[in-house]
Amino acid sequence: MMKVLVVIALLVTLISYSSSEGIDDLEADELLSLMANEQTRKECIPKHHECTSNKHGCCRGNFFKYKCQCTTVVTQDGEQTERCFCGTPPHHKAAELVVGFGKKIFG
């Protein structure tokens, strides 16, 4: 029983010490990461826009991040080119439909 109390006291001391030491660093790190996230959000590619040159730059949707979906387009000259756009994959659409339906039923 005494060992358990000593271990608990040691853990409480370590947690309080580490949290007091790192609060200022944590706040600065959080601020920098929030600023980076805002910058990333501004630069992401919206749904239905072309992502051929940046296949990992699609924005987030309601529940999931949009995926860059590519198709091969054949021109009248017979040339094949790849065209990509940001969109919601079918399995994500199904999940969003189920969640939306569940929200309507259960409030």
UniProtKB/Swiss-Prot annotation:
Identify the GO cellular component terms for this protein.
extracellular region
Signal sequence range: 1-20
**Keywords carried by this UniProt record:** Disulfide bond, Knottin, Secreted, Signal, Toxin
**Pro-region residues?**
21-41
PROSITE patterns (UniProt xref): SPIDER_CSTX (PS60029)
Q: List the disulfide bonds.
A: C44-C59, C51-C68, C58-C86, C70-C84
What is the protein's major site of localization?
secreted
Q: Which domain of life is it from?
A: Eukaryota
Where does this polypeptide localize?
A: Secreted
**Claim: Signal is one of the keywords in the record:** yes
Acetylation: is it a keyword of this entry?
Answer: no
Q: Which InterPro entries match?
A: Spider_toxin_CSTX_knottin, Spider_toxin_CSTX_Knottin_CS
By sequence similarity, the record places it as follows:
Belongs to the neurotoxin 19 (CSTX) family. 04 (U1-Lctx) subfamily.
What's in the domain note?
The presence of a 'disulfide through disulfide knot' structurally defines this protein as a knottin.
Which protein, by its recorded name, is this? U1-lycotoxin-Ls1b
Q: Which organism is it from?
A: Lycosa singoriensis (Wolf spider)
